[in-house]
Amino acid sequence: MSGQQERAERQREELSASASPPSRFVLGLDVGSTVIRCHVYDQTARVRGSSAQKVENVYPQPGWVEIDPDSLWAQFVAVIKDAVKAAGVQMNQIVGLGISTQRATFITWNKKTGHHFHNFISWQDLRAAELVKSWNNSLIMKLLHGATRVLHFFSRSKVMLTVSRFNFSTQHATLRLTWILQNLSEVKRAVEEDNCCFGTIDTWLLYKLTKGSSYATDYSNASTTGFFDPYAMRWSRLITTMVSIPLSILPPVKDTSYNFGSVDEKIFGVPIPVVALVGDQQSAMFGECCFETGDVKLTMGTGTFLDINTGKNLQHVNGGFYPLIGWKIGQELVCLAEGNAGDTGTAIMWAQKLDLFTDAAETEKMALSLEDSEGVYFVPSFSGLQAPLNDPCACASFMGLKHSTNKYHLVRAILESIAFRNKQLYDMLQREIQIPVTNIRADGGVCNNAFVMQMTSDLINEKIDRPAHFDMSCLGAASLAGLAVGFWADKEELQKLRQSEMVFKPQKKWQEYEVNMENWVKAVKRSMNWYNKT
């Protein structure tokens, strides 16, 4: 071939390339409790560009946890722009945005002006702890439980059984919103004037992205607020009436994978479709491809969340695990049962602030350098103790400290406490959920710690699959968005794209840990009811 022919061939190839449509991508964004992160995904589910910023929580008083909405909005916009730039693509190549968020963190704002009345009140916030205790011990709750137990006896209704076991929690938005109405007159007045909007982070971001033209949430987020009736698939008139919250301030509830509207062009230069809103744990479940009944996900991030796919049916539980909507896509409805421990990554970050180590990655080697923690035990309870103990007044503590205790013992005790809490949650799942476990898949930043992963596998005597990609909430949001716009054909295609990095198998028997865990449980019991004011 002559030089002239070669040049002509190259020109034809260049023209052909320029004529072909540009590659398409989807965005998966997760607003976690610690980090806000965005990934750009191609059609092989490979991350092409990323950006992350630390979520700056505000602590106005002990036990209060807030997020500045203006700061969060600036971070949200920045990580999307930076991720797209890092991917080396253009905004007009983004065909869909999926948003995963920490759940039950809420805000209220002026319906007419869009201005917020206060900061986001985090799901970790404990300002309503006394209100929760008061309500759970109230005559109203005792009458409700008694009446529904009788009704369940005669009707065998699952709804009545669930209501008979219902208790308020500080993690629900319910009584934190009640606290706001009792203490912020501006919000109370706006509610009375029908000028107040309530929203979890997903709802507020959608409202901001669409310049107020879209106001909605999805079923996964709604089901974690404490206001939602998952049996009737609507906001609960019973709960809202009990706590005097008008239904009018709650947003419409839509499918998880759904066209919620397009981003206002002024924000990113193009109208990117917002096609998925999802709670972070449900999103991680979807990202892990836990699509079958019995599939289990163990997320270890800021907190630990253990979820099991219960199929189309909600599980009526005994107050440890709680029923949730996993996702709703058209006619497909998937339900979950979930249990959680509030302080996992939180405990590790706290230890880092104390200069016990400089990088969380060091903790694995520190723990493995010792035979044991030398009788030191840590209770991870900065935000109270969740199921099966359910004590918002518990305190975080070290017990068993000695002259010989050093930072290595403290670090190992912290990591062991995470594994012990995992064991408690898994045992509770086995007791309460009458569904055989098929697979266990882990995700979240703490699952990068092989010491915690191996100890958890030993304690529960099960294999645990760790994926190649840890940011499952981002991937789940992107997957849901991709399905909505035809970027991926179906869930079967997503399953084929999933990659496993390592499977942890039990190496020690439970009996080798039994005495250690019994002593840890003693430490936990001594930390309970510490902040009780009555």
Swiss-Prot record:
It comes from the Eukaryota. It catalyses: glycerol + ATP = sn-glycerol 3-phosphate + ADP + H(+). It is an enzyme of class 2 (transferase). Pathway: Polyol metabolism; glycerol degradation via glycerol kinase pathway; sn-glycerol 3-phosphate from glycerol: step 1/1. One of its GO terms (molecular function) is glycerol kinase activity. Belongs to the FGGY kinase family. Skin-specific kinase that plays a key role in glycerol metabolism, catalyzing its phosphorylation to produce sn-glycerol 3-phosphate. Involved in skin-specific regulation of sterol regulatory element-binding protein (SREBP) processing and lipid biosynthesis. This is Glycerol kinase 5. It comes from Mus musculus.
